[in-house]
Amino acid sequence: MEVKFFEGDWIWDEEIYPNVYSCAMVYANGKGFRVFEISDRKNEVHELLDFMRKVKKAGHRLVGFNSVHFDYPLLHHILTKSRKVLKEGKELKITAKELYDVGMKLIKNQYDEDNKFGSAIRDKDVIIKQVDLFLIHHFNNMAKSTSLKMLEVNMRSQNVADLPFPVGKVLTNDEIDILLHYNKHDVKETLKFYYYSYEAIQLRKDLSITFGFDCTNFSDSKIGETLFINRLEQAKTGLCYTQSKHGGRKINQTKRPNGIKIKECLFDYLKFDRPEFKAVHTWFKDQVITETKGVFSDLLEHQIGDVAKYAEMKV
């Protein structure tokens, strides 16, 4: 495979345990590996900050896997706290335990169904530009969700390594050394996937210029959705969103207090011959919903009418 990369990209990954935080990164050409550690035995937070200042000053980017919702918010905590204490003239104190607590909160937020945007930092507040391969390939979609380990298998990696210790374990010095090795391994595998993703990243770079909005971390479908909405808004301002006094915007939604009749959403040309399909079709036409998320999940037998008798049918 021909190796193509963008100048100024750093591939990175973080690991966090109660007594150790590690951040590993390598330049997009595969050279210049760096590993920073914050633990009971070593605290390289100032070295990490010095390096990040150079990355920021050079206009470079950090490329990760699920970094927008985890790795970067954790780094952002370090960067913003550093700025705050510097402004106040105080000494910077950051421990692995502090970062671990932040990390666990970030993970919890990722599984919060009521928190649509998780822990992502607002674009205008991001200090160092991010490229997230996880989002670009739409792996945040439940139907497409894929782990880095699965990608390692698909990329025919010689070594597929999983997290060496259970989450929350207090590590010994020897175990910390193993964790640092694992952290570097994940960065190498992310780098490999970055090479596979070159054309997708280039496309988003070109489209961002063409359409006038940053779609670096957008999936293919989100690019289309955003472009469509922008075109509608250009044709008639306020068609899709209502602007707030504070500069934000709220999506316009049609209120349906009496629910949505599914039969009104089904095309008339839908016809089925098999009895089990007819049963499903008939059942859907009888449904009225007031929510759209999870309403047809975990249904009991008495709730699905004639469909139940076909549930275990072999075809």
Language model region names:
Residues 1-7, 52-56, 303-315:
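A short acidic-Thr-Gly-centered motif at the start of a beta-strand
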Residues 18-23:
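Short N-terminal binding/cap micro-motifs at the start of the first secondary-structure element
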Residues 7, 24, 28-29, 35:
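Generic N-terminal leader segments that precede the first folded domain
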Residues 6-16, 132, 315:
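Two-metal-ion RNase H-like nuclease active-site motif
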Residues 26-28, 77-82, 207-208:
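Short secondary-structure boundary/capping segments
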Residues 32-150:
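Conserved DEDDh/DEDDy metal-dependent 3′-5′ exonuclease domain
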Residues 9, 70, 185:
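Short, well-structured alpha-helical interface segments that form or flank functional binding sites
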Residues 146, 154-162, 168-315:
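Conserved "right-hand" nucleotidyltransferase catalytic core of DNA-directed polymerases
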